[in-house]
C-alpha cells in the first residue's frame, strides 16, 4: 500500500473491534435473539450477568445467522412492540451487520431501534446506552462513544462490555493510561478473548511486543469457539506481519482460515503474504475475492495499491474510484472517515484535502495514529518543520510501526537531517521490509540515495 495505507487499514480494523466485540456481547445477552451461532465473533470465554439481569457475554456471529436473528427480532417486535430490550438487541444487531457487510446504511436503522428502546424505557436502560456507545464507535465518534459508555456504566458498573467499549474509545482519543484502566477493569470482570485482545493492542501501541504476543496467546487459549480462535489467530498473524516475520504470519493466517474460513480479514492477511512472496496470481485472486465479499475502503485501497505496484494503472484507478464512492456512502450515513481518507488522499494526489481532513481530526483527538496522519499530511503540503513535531509525537509511545518510521524518515530527509533520516528509514525496513506495496520500495530507494550521497 501507500505510505500509510496498511497502517490505515489496521486502524480501521482496530477501531472496528469496538463495534464487533461490543455489539456481539450485547446481542449475546438477549434471549429474543436466541443462540447466535456461526463464525466471525469475538466472544469472551466467560459469561457473567450484568446488573440489569442480562447476560453480558458475546457470541460468534456470521452475516447469515445475524440476518436471521434480525428477521426473527423484527417479527417479534411486530407482535410485541413494547419490548424495549428487544429494540436494544435489534439496534446492536444492526451495528454488527454494518460491520460484517461493510454496509453503513444499517447505522441509521440501529439509531432508530435504540431510540425506540430508550423512548419505551428511558430510565436505567444500560442496554440501549451501551449499544449507542457501540454505534458511536462504529461511526468513529469516539467522544460520543466514551460519553455513552460512561452513562451506561453509571447504571451498570459491572458490565465488562461497557468497560471494553469505554477503553476502545479512550485508545482512539489518545488517552492511553485511562484506556489501560478500563481494559484492566474489563479483565477483572470477565477475563477472556475480548479483554486479552484489547490489552494486547495496548501493549503493541507501547512497543511491548512480548506482552502483546502473550496476551493474544491467552486470547487464543481461552477462545470458546472456532470463530473466536480465528479472530485471535488473525491478530497473531498481524503481530508477526508487522514484525516482518512472513513465515509465522502465513502460518497464523492459514491456521485462522482453517478455524474460521468466513473471517475475511484472514483472507487479506493471506493475500498480502502472497504478494510479499511474489505469488502474484494467488495474491490477485485473494484480493479480488476479498473486495468482492467485503468492500470496506481499507481493503479496496490496499488492492488498488497492489495493482499500482504491478503497473496495472487502469485497474488500480478503478479501485480508487470505488473508494470515493464508498467515502460518500459512509459520510452520508454519519460515519467519520477523515483519518482513513487523510492518508489515502495524501498518497494519491489530493494533498490539500488530506491536510484539511487530518487537521479536522487532530482537533477531535490526539492519538498517535492521528498525529502520524497529520504529520504526513503536513509534509505532503510542504510544512516539514511542523510535520516533524507530530511525527515525533506519533512515535512517543514506542510503537514499532514501520509506516510511522518511514514517515518520519522522509520528513527528516526533507529537512536535511540526513543521519536521522537514514536511521529511521533503516528502522522502518528492519521492522518490516514489506510494510507497504508502494512506500517500502520508496523507503529503500531513499535510504540508498541518502547513504551514498555526500554528507553535509
Where are the language model's segments positioned?
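N-terminal leader/linker segments that initiate helical-solenoid repeat arrays
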Residues: 3-127, 147, 433-434, 441, ...
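Residue-level recognition of tetratricopeptide repeat
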Residues: 92, 99, 134, 168, ...
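Canonical tetratricopeptide repeat
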Residues: 89, 131, 165, 198-199, ...
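Register position in tetratricopeptide repeats
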Residues: 96, 103, 138, 172-173, ...
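Short coil turns that delineate tetratricopeptide repeat
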Residues: 81, 122-123, 157, 190-191, ...
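Start-of-helix register in tetratricopeptide repeats
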Residues: 85, 92, 126-127, 161, ...
Amino acid at each position: 500500500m501507500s505510505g500509510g495505507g496498511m497502517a490505515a487499514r489496521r486502524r480501521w480494523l482496530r477501531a472496528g473491534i469496538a463495534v464487533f466485540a461490543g455489539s456481539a456481547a450485547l446481542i449475546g445477552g438477549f434471549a429474543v435473539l436466541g443462540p447466535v451461532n456461526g463464525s466471525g465473533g469475538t466472544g469472551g470465554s466467560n459469561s457473567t450477568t450484568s446488573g440489569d439481569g442480562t447476560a453480558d457475554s458475546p457470541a460468534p456471529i456470521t452475516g447469515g445467522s445475524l440476518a436471521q436473528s434480525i428477521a426473527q427480532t423484527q417479527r417479534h417486535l411486530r407482535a410485541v412492540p413494547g419490548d424495549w430490550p428487544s429494540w436494544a438487541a435489534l439496534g446492536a444487531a444492526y451495528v454488527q451487520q454494518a460491520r460484517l457487510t461493510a454496509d453503513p446504511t444499517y447505522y441509521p436503522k440501529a439509531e432508530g431501534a435504540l431510540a425506540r428502546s430508550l423512548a419505551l424505557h428511558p430510565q436505567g436502560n444500560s442496554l440501549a446506552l451501551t449499544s449507542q456507545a457501540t454505534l458511536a464507535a462504529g461511526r468513529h465518534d469516539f467522544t460520543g462513544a466514551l460519553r455513552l459508555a460512561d452513562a451506561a456504566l453509571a447504571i451498570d458498573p459491572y458490565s465488562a462490555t461497557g468497560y471494553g467499549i469505554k477503553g476502545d474509545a479512550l485508545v482512539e482519543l489518545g488517552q492511553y493510561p485511562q484506556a489501560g484502566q478500563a481494559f484492566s477493569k474489563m479483565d477483572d470482570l470477565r477475563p477472556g478473548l475480548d479483554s486479552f485482545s484489547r490489552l494486547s493492542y495496548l501493549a503493541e501501541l507501547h512497543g511491548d511486543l512480548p506482552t502483546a504476543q502473550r496476551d493474544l496467546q491467552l486470547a487464543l487459549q481461552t477462545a470458546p469457539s472456532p470463530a473466536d480462535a480465528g479472530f485471535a489467530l488473525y491478530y497473531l498473524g498481524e503481530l508477526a506481519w508487522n514484525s516482518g516475520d512472513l513465515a509465522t504470519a502465513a502460518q497464523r493466517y492459514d491456521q485462522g482460515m482453517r478455524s474460521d474460513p468466513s473471517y475475511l480479514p484472514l483472507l487479506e492477511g493471506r493475500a498480502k503474504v502472497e504478494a510479499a512472496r511474489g505469488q502474484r496470481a494467488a495474491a490477485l485472486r485473494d484480493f479480488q475475492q476479498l473486495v468482492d465479499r467485503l468492500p470496506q475502503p481499507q481493503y479496496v485501497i490496499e488492492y488498488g495499491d497492489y495493482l499500482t505496484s504491478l503497473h496495472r494503472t487502469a485497474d488500480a484507478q478503478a479501485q480508487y474510484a470505488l473508494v470515493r464512492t464508498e467515502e460518500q456512502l459512509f459520510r452520508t450515513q454519519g460515519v467519520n472517515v477523515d483519518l482513513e481518507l487523510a492518508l489515502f488522499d495524501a498518497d494519491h494526489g489530493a494533498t490539500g484535502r488530506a491536510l484539511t481532513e487530518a487537521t479536522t481530526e487532530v482537533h477531535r483527538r490526539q492519538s498517535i495514529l492521528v498525529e502520524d496522519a497529520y504529520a504526513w499530511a503536513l509534509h505532503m503540503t510542504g510544512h516539514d518543520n511542523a510535520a516533524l513535531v507530530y511525527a515525533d509525537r506519533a512515535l512517543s509511545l514506542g510503537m514499532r510501526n514501520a509506516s510511522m518510521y518511514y514517515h518520519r524518515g522522509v520528513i527528516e530527509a526533507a529537512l536535511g537531517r540526513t543521519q536521522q533520516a537514514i536511521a529511521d528509514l533503516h528502522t522502518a525496513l528492519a521492522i518490516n521490509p514489506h510494510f507497504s506495496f508502494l512506500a517500502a520500495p520508496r523507503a529503500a530507494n531513499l535510504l540508498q540515495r541518502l547513504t551514498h550521497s555526500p554528507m553535509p
